């Protein structure tokens, strides 16, 4: 099974769970970055959108989708409105999402799933870093 198929299987398993991935993800994120909580004016809406977008980006990367790069670049640009967001925070969010997937799936989480999700997470983090560097060149932060 290729990475995209493995990830699709993961998402199918996730959909069968009575748990929303976003709750644990945001508990983790706000525990590590408590100052960021204030930036979320409506966390119930924002957490759904950001979790779904990140899952879509990771899955899109696995499938070689061309829309991923423009969306990443746009998301990084729009996040500049929230002030200085260090690359480490983006990286931590992506890593936490994969960790939360593993936690939610428990015994159904396989080595193949871990490999697929971690590989795409690394690719996404690299892409976010590239987008941030390009935006900093044309629209410096601060």
Regions found by a protein language model. Name each.
Residues 1-142:
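Globin-like tetrapyrrole-binding proteins
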């Amino acid at each position: 099974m290729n990475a995209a198929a493995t990830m699709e299987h993961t998402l199918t398993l996730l959909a069968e769970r009575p748990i929303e991935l976003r709750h644990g993800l945001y508990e983790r994120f706000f525990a590590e970055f408590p100052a960021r909580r204030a930036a979320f004016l409506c966390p119930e809406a924002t957490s759904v959108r950001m979790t779904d977008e990140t899952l879509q980006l990771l899955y899109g990367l696995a499938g070689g989708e061309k829309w991923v790069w423009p969306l990443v670049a746009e998301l990084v640009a729009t996040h500049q409105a929230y002030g200085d967001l260090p690359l480490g925070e983006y990286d931590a969010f992506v890593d936490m999402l994969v960790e939360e997937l593993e936690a939610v799936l428990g015994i159904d989480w396989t080595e193949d799933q871990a490999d697929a999700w971690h590989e795409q997470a690394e690719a996404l983090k690299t892409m976010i870093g590239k987008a941030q560097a390009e935006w900093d060149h044309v629209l410096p932060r601060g």
